[in-house]
Every structure is written in structure tokens, then in C-alpha cells.
A protein has these predicted regions:
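Intramembrane alpha-helical segments
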Residues: 76-78, 82-174
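Functional transmembrane core segments of multi-pass inner-membrane proteins
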Residues: 155-202
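C-terminal membrane-associated helical module and adjoining short loops/tails
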Residues: 183-200, 204, 217-253
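Topogenic membrane-insertion module of multi-pass membrane proteins
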Residues: 1-39, 43, 47, 138-146, ...
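Membrane-embedded alpha-helical segments that form the functional core of polytopic membrane enzymes
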Residues: 25, 33-58, 123-136, 176-196
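C-terminal ends of transmembrane helices
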Residues: 2-4, 56-59, 79, 133-146, ...
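Multi-pass membrane catalytic core of lipid/isoprenoid biosynthesis enzymes
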Residues: 72-114, 210-245
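Acidic (Asp/Glu-rich) catalytic motifs at the cytosolic membrane interface
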Residues: 50-74, 191-214
Length: 253
């Protein structure tokens, strides 16, 4: 039971709702369509959670072995930092969750496309592999992109674009402008969450050479950057919502 609690701590359960936000929005856009699949929707939720757990394990591992998670770090203590799991055990956890995520992703892809289009199958399998790489490479490796100020871009891409547009396309086999705008909105909200965490960790990140966007910008500009992200996210989200209301009443009246 104690070991299970340690793995739950490493999985960072409070981060999981954010990981499924794009999936929820992408599928919500498809709910009124006759070919909407609840099976595909549930699979997408499990896949998104799996990718987030991979990222959390890898984040713990990468920051731990680089010394970023040290006694000066503000925020919750990590399992590797506390010695609750060894590097080897945590690495095995990353490998295991990567296999789980890829198996679930392949199941989703073949259920969604069957033999309709091998091009779509190949593209989405490639995207799944890339997603695993991105989840791990944020902090792991000599060229970890989270240490080069690229974390914000990847969060926008995966939490927004891949999550919302991927969910929408898997359900309907097409794309739309509302889906694109909402993908940007969810992406900006997600980058905002990352930015808040990086603002909290700014001093320690700068000291250990982790060049996040906040470290590049400085505290004052990072706050302005955060306001811009939130304003854009809200405008896009509300804009899509209001346009749908206008279309609804215009159609019925």
C-alpha cells in the first residue's frame, strides 16, 4: 500500500484534469453528431491521462538527476528528490507507462479508422510516438527542451492542438474553425498553468541553468506574458461560445 501511494504521488493526480481538458472540449464539439463514439471518447481520456503520467514521471526523473529538484526548490517535494523511488525504478515506470499509452493509442487508432485510410493510421501512430518522446524529453536528456525555453510551445501544441483537434478529427474525420480556435484557447490556458509553475520556480531554475520562458523574460515580463495568455484564451473561448449561440438562435428564429 505504501508503494502504491508513492506511485500516486509521482503521478501527480492534481495535474490530470488539465491533461483531459482538450479531450473534453474536442469531444464536446462532436456530441450532437450521429456518429459520435463514447468508446473512442473513453479511450482518449485514458490515453491523455497516460501521457500526462509519463510526463510527470519523466519530469521527476529528469529534474532529479540534473539536480534541479534540490533543497532550494519551492513547491511539493518529488519522489526521486526524497529518495522514495530509485532512478532505475522510476525509469522502469516511464517505460511501462509509455507501453500502456502506445497500446491504448494503437487500439484507439484502429477502432477509429479501421481500414478506411492507412495514411490516417500511420500519421496518428507517428503522432503517438512523437507524443511519448515529447512527454519524456521535456526534462530528460542533454537536449531537454524544457531547459531551452521551448516548454511553452510544446504545451500549446500538445494540450491544445493535438488534444482538441486530434479528438475532433478522430470522432468526425474532419476539422473545423471552431475546433481550431478552441484548440488555441485550451493551449493558451495550459501554457498559463505552466507559466505560473515556472514563475514559482524562477529563482531555482535560473540558478541551475533551466532556461524556462520565465527565466528568459524575467518576473515582470512573465506576469505580462501571463495576462496576454489568459486574455487570448478567454477571448477565443467566449468567441466560439457566443458565435454558436448566435447561429443557434439565427437558425431557429
Amino acid at each position: 500500500m505504501q508503494q502504491f501511494k508513492i506511485w500516486l504521488s509521482a503521478a501527480r493526480l492534481r495535474t490530470l484534469p488539465l491533461s483531459i481538458s482538450g479531450i473534453l472540449v474536442g469531444n464536446a464539439l462532436c456530441l450532437n453528431q450521429p456518429n459520435f463514439s463514447w468508446v473512442l471518447f473513453v479511450l482518449m481520456l485514458f490515453i491523455a491521462i497516460s501521457f500526462q503520467i509519463i510526463s510527470n514521471f519523466a519530469n521527476d526523473y529528469g529534474d532529479g538527476i540534473k539536480g534541479t529538484d534540490n533543497e532550494n526548490r519551492v513547491g511539493p517535494k518529488r519522489v526521486l528528490q526524497q529518495g522514495l523511488l530509485s532512478k532505475e525504478v522510476l525509469k522502469n515506470g516511464i517505460i511501462f507507462m509509455s507501453l500502456v499509452a502506445l497500446i491504448l493509442a494503437c487500439t484507439l487508432i484502429f477502432l477509429a479508422f479501421e481500414s478506411q485510410s492507412w495514411l490516417y493510421i500511420i500519421v496518428f501512430i507517428g503522432l503517438s510516438i512523437f507524443s511519448v518522446w515529447a512527454a519524456i524529453s521535456y526534462t530528460v536528456g542533454d537536449k531537454a527542451y524544457g531547459y531551452r525555453g521551448l516548454g511553452d510551445l510544446f504545451v500549446l501544441l500538445f494540450f491544445g492542438g493535438v488534444s482538441v483537434l486530434g479528438a475532433y478529427f478522430i470522432q468526425l474525420k474532419t476539422l473545423s474553425f471552431p475546433a481550431f480556435y478552441l484548440a488555441l484557447s485550451i493551449g493558451f490556458f495550459s501554457v498559463g498553468v505552466l507559466n505560473l509553475n515556472n514563475m514559482r520556480d524562477q529563482a531555482n531554475d535560473a540558478a541551475v541553468g533551466k532556461k524556462t520562458m520565465v527565466v528568459f523574460l524575467g518576473a515582470k515580463r512573465a506576469k505580462m506574458y501571463h495576462i496576454i495568455l489568459m486574455v487570448l484564451a478567454i477571448i477565443l473561448f467566449v468567441g466560439v461560445f457566443l458565435s454558436n449561440i448566435i447561429l443557434f438562435f439565427g437558425y431557429h428564429f
